[in-house]
Every structure is written in structure tokens, then in C-alpha cells.
Amino acid sequence: MKNLKFIKPFFVEEIDENPISGKFTIKPLERGYGITVGNALRRVLLSSLPGAAIVNVKIQGVEQEFTTIPGVYEDVMTIILNLKKIVFAVDDESDDFEEKLELIAKGPQRLTAASFELPAGVKIINPDHYITTLSDDVCFHMTVTIKKGIGYVGAKENKVHIENQVGVIAIDSLFTPVVNVSYQVEKKLGNKDELTIEITTNGALLAKEALATAASILVDHFNVLVELSQKPAHVEFVSESKKEAHNYVLDLEIEQLDLSVRLFNSLKRAGIDTVASLVKLSEKEVVKLKSLGRKSFQELKDKFLEYGLEFNDYLKEALHHSVEEDKDKH
């Protein structure tokens, strides 16, 4: 039986990125794979990326969360709610990372996340985040413990680590650095899928770092399944070489390129029906085509650039692969 071959995406474009979000386009994908890949990435991004968060808090003079503190505007429960929203970035690769942070202050004063004393390797992404306000002459001493984790961990689970510690209050922890993920799939050339995925983080890591980490997690899981069979044919079934990706594009008809009417008609009148016949022409020959002006020529070059290649590079490399294939056949 002949091995099936799937087109593997060979183009990832970072459309837009800022410190808390990014949009990426992945193409080409086999029909149906846009949803398959997009959904898998989304689930991993939202549930499985590691992060750092506060797991417990100790406030001097406080034994439990259902109380108030003289001279402190917020009650303990409100202070805890505010602490949960502080975003940490930790420069430590160890899974068992743990650090205690202290906040010592005297009123009158407005306390924010920036009021904490930070050790090396720990950064607060939202230092202006409000915690509480102290009135005149009030001394306030608070210690929090931050750890690394995945997803959401409730106070009940965090409490296991602080048994018999008087005055230490376990809190809920949201470790995941990804706030939101959305994706859409469009049908493109040759009935292939184009996946656009948009990621919003809490600022602890860049969107492209989140995407790469999620992809790595998926690969690690699938590698376990791949190892069940050592048959070379199985590997070939799921992979695609760059040469085959080029040949896929060469086989496309120009109707599938979504060109402007002017450019499409110019190519058709010149007897050019496929990408393969188009790349056989030099740039000078293309420019000389009837009714094809500078704007249309630039559109054509942009179409090649969509696949990460300059027109001349594409011409040389694609034709080289075609010639090599012909040699192999003979």
C-alpha cells in the first residue's frame, strides 16, 4: 500500500504581538487539520502552561481570614482577593521553586504589589496593582509564599503544605499565564486550511513563548505514541519534507491563488495556468506580460512571499527540486 502523505505547515506568521497578546497564522494545513490543531493548542494553552502565584499568606496579628485589622481599610478577605491578582514572572526552571516575600509598611500609606521586597529572579508584572490602604501610625507586616504550578489549585489543596502553621492562610492559586485563546480557520489554496490563533497572556510571558511551549507539550505527549511503533512508514505518514511542500505549491492552478482579476487575466492570456509554469519565467519575462503593470507584479511577488520566500529564491529552489525529482524517476 502506498504511504499517504500529508502537507505539513511550513509557514508561521506573527501578525501582531505586544507584551500581553499575539496573533499568529499557521499554513498550509490539510483539510480539517485547522480545527484539530487549533483546538489542541487552545486546550493546552489554557490548562497546561506553568506559572507562579501566591499559595499562602501570613499577616501579623491575624489568625484567620474572616476578620478585620484595625487601621487597615480592607478586611482580610478583600486583601486576599487582591493578592490573588498579582502576576509574577519567575526566572527559575526548577519545578520545586518556592520563595517567601515580605511586605513591611507603616501608615498612612497606600500599598500595592510594588510594596513587596523582591529577591533576585522574581518580578511582578503588575506592580501598580492595589492591595490595601493603611491609616495613621498603623504597622503592617505580611509574608506571602509563591510557588510554581499549573492551572488552578484551590485553597484546600494548598492547605496541605501548611498544616500546624499558626496564622498561615492558604489561598486559591491561578498559575496559568494564559488569559484567553481564540482561533479561526479559513479555507485557502487547494482546499487547505489556514489557522489563525490569537493568544492573550497575563504578561508573565510573551504570546509566542506560550504558543511554542504548548506545541512542545503536545509533541512530548505524541512522541510517546510514536514510540509504540518503530516503522519508518509511520513517521513518513505524519511528516512532510520541504521539497514536497514546494511541489504542492507548484501543482496549484492560478485560480487557487486568489489573485486580482487584472493579474489573473494577464496570466491566463499568457497561457500560464499553474504555479509551475509561472515560476519558469524570469522576473523580466513576467514584467513584460501584456496588461501586467507594477502593481500586479508586486501583488504576484507578495503572493510568493506569503510562503516565506522571495520570488527568485523560490524560482531557483523549486525548480531545483523538480529537476532532482525528474532525475530520481529516471
From Swiss-Prot:
EC numbers, comma separated: 2.7.7.6
SUPFAM superfamilies given in the database record: C-terminal domain of RNA polymerase alpha subunit, Insert subdomain of RNA polymerase alpha subunit, RBP11-like subunits of RNA polymerase
Keywords: DNA-directed RNA polymerase, Nucleotidyltransferase, Transcription, Transferase
Signal peptide: none
Broadest EC class assigned to this enzyme: transferase
Gene Ontology CC annotations of this record: cytoplasm; DNA-directed RNA polymerase complex
Catalytic activities: RNA(n) + a ribonucleoside 5'-triphosphate = RNA(n+1) + diphosphate
Subunit annotation: Homodimer. The RNAP catalytic core consists of 2 alpha, 1 beta, 1 beta' and 1 omega subunit. When a sigma factor is associated with the core the holoenzyme is formed, which can initiate transcription.
Protein name per its UniProtKB record: DNA-directed RNA polymerase subunit alpha
